[in-house]
UniProtKB/Swiss-Prot annotation:
Taxonomic path: Bacteria, Bacillati, Bacillota, Bacilli, Lactobacillales
Any matching Pfam family: Thymidylate_kin
Catalytic activity reported: dTMP + ATP = dTDP + ADP
EC id: 2.7.4.9
Protein family (similarity comment): Belongs to the thymidylate kinase family.
Gene Ontology CC, one term: cytosol
Summary of the function given for this chain in its UniProt record: Phosphorylation of dTMP to form dTDP in both de novo and salvage pathways of dTTP synthesis.
Transmembrane segments: none
Binding site for ATP: 11-18
UniProt KW keywords: ATP-binding, Kinase, Nucleotide biosynthesis, Nucleotide-binding, Transferase
One GO MF term attached to the UniProt entry: dTMP kinase activity
Protein name: Thymidylate kinase
Biological processes annotated in GO: dTDP biosynthetic process; dTTP biosynthetic process; dUDP biosynthetic process
The species this protein was found in: Leuconostoc citreum (strain KM20)
Annotated InterPro entries: P-loop_NTPase, Thymidylate_kin-like_dom, Thymidylate_kin_CS, Thymidylate_kinase
């Protein structure tokens, strides 16, 4: 008998987590079949995807920082209800590209709204639901942003365009979260070649999948 497994991928801009996820899903899908569900935040269902379009335009839309934080939490709540909980209730493996730690890092740290404040907002949204495993891909802000500018080919949103100091605060907050919740959040050195990052991530996923059995 197997139990459900909730895994999240986190990281600052340019860490390469989405590329790693795509590579490993192509390996896992033939093994797990419909027992594997992949999703993203903000998004994962029509309502949350609509909120994503508001949150991530190419240019600054004048959104207030607290409005931004509340919209991310709202998108997350719908994502949980419509996508995450049904998958976990069915005993599946769900991997999400971002979850609540993104709000803590980006709005709590980057926007300087305070991690505790953002946590309180999101407590109402997640109702205690935390991942079994969070894989955090760490990269210095300067390197991450240079990757974004080189690789996204015009797909630059307003968060990408934030100041270097904003992105440095995001990374600092992620590292603090990883330190404080090291049992859940595992760190990957994302400055390595992509093949090495994939290999390190594969090992963490395999360990989590093995623990699911029993």
């Amino acid at each position: 008998m197997t139990r459900p497994l909730f895994i999240t991928f986190e990281g600052p801009e340019g860490a390469g987590k989405t590329s790693v996820l795509e590579a490993l899903v192509s390996e896992l899908k033939p093994i797990l079949g419909d027992q594997l569900v992949t999703t993203r935040e903000p998004g994962g269902n029509p309502i949350s995807e609509a909120i994503r379009q508001i949150l991530q335009p190419e240019d600054d839309n004048g959104m207030d920082d607290r409005t931004e934080a509340l919209l991310y939490a709202a998108a997350r709540r719908q994502h949980i209800v419509e996508t995450i909980l049904p998958a976990l209730s069915a005993g599946k493996v769900l991997i999400s590209d971002r979850y609540v730690d993104s709000s803590l890092a980006y709005q709590g740290g980057g926007r300087d709204l305070g991690v505790d404040n953002i946590w309180q907002i999101n407590q109402f949204a997640i109702d205690g639901l935390l991942p079994d495993l969070t894989i955090y891909f760490d990269v210095p802000s300067e390197l991450g942003l240079s990757r974004v500018m080189a690789n996204r080919q015009g797909k630059i949103d307003r968060l990408d365009k934030e100041s270097l100091s904003f992105h440095q605060r995001v990374r600092t907050t992620y590292l603090e979260l990883q330190h404080d919740f090291s049992d859940r959040i595992k760190i990957i050195d994302a400055t390595q070649p992509l093949t090495d990052v994939i290999s390190d991530t594969r090992a963490l996923l395999q360990e989590a999948l093995n623990s699911r059995k029993g």
